[in-house]
């Protein structure tokens, strides 16, 4: 139950009764704790339509509200705010209801939807680096959130395995080892099962090939021709390319496993290749595509968005072509309600073109919503894209090792590597996801690793503290679900209990905002606020030495609720919580 929605519905009945539109009854969390828990600001915009002063409208609404079981206090403030304070029993009862629900008050979306999530997107032959973090972590959080809310999710890594870089690699290896059978056009036998290069060698070959092609137009033409021949099915090139893909996927899977990020599908641009001819024929049959200076293009019919080149002059396909073919494939195979792409904001124009063409040509059905979660860049302290001290791109594996070092340095007596791993992951993931995805942000690992402030380790520390209370009382194998039946939250005895209860019942609000806006930072902010409220409660509300047994049990229930809410919230952003720290 989203408490903002519940209160909005309660006030909407009064608005309707008085002849006002229900849309003005929206209730939001108060921006000032000193005046109330929630507020309704609808009287101000309503005044223009009702031809009344907003203060008079607010007073009229409050006068007609009859819900003493929900509200302890309703106050009107200029120019027309309605400040709402919840009744202590309603607050306690709602906390209990959430504690005893499987999803801490969150209800499944109805009807359930099928959502395809496209994220990760590493390129073959390139090791994963810091720049891949945002897509991987943001996409993983979104798939967790969508599944939690009841959607059927299909996640796809969508490998970059079919572009000009493949031709660059082929030509570079051909230059180094022309004797390999992959380059003999007359060879008809079976190709070797072992790759002629390792993934480490690929990572060295690609920069060299890229540099050569950028400095020599003839080399670039060779790479483009090799790419075209690969896409046309030249046997030796296909066999060599298959080695590139296989060894790259093995390496990439290890990187994603280290982040606890997983995919349902491991498809790439190449998997859409077999749909391109069928799709082009469809475009031609329906007069969507036309020739322009030797290339084949499709108009977007959107102001400021240029046409999409589908086939180049040389007959090769573009990045946009494979993206359209991927949409074609997904639409036919999965029939989704929504497809979400978690990709760098520098690709925004590209996705505007692809989405516009896909919708105009009905590559996707009318019910299917296309969304680009366009995230900002990961920058260093200097405000530029994050680099190593030597100025190079930091590989993901090196970043994780560095995070583990920070965790170990702050806990030198900790010998359990699994706990160090959990702290390192919390450091990286929370440090990234606490930021609104649309913004660039500074990646400061030293700051993220602190055990206080808005950090992952602080969250872990708080939950471990709450768990230790329960463990001292119930032993190691306690079960919150069964214990909650006998431990009930009661009306708050002080401001610390009240603020903790109020924070706990706002969990569904954070989840709904994260879900609707594809913004996991709402869950991060919620978890941080809950951690602060619990730590103040912990300091000011003793449990073990209490003589009042009913109060003791009520505070234990608040500890249970905190552990449950924090555990779910942490899982939604891909963070696992240790038993101790």
Curated annotation (Swiss-Prot):
UniProt KW keywords: Aminoacyl-tRNA synthetase, ATP-binding, Cytoplasm, Ligase, Nucleotide-binding, Protein biosynthesis
Reaction(s) catalysed by this chain's protein: tRNA(Arg) + L-arginine + ATP = L-arginyl-tRNA(Arg) + AMP + diphosphate
Record gene name: argS
The protein, known as: Arginine--tRNA ligase
Organism: Francisella tularensis subsp. tularensis (strain WY96-3418)
Keyword Ligase in record: yes
Main location: cytoplasm
HAMAP family (alphabetical): Arg_tRNA_synth
Residues annotated as signal peptide: none
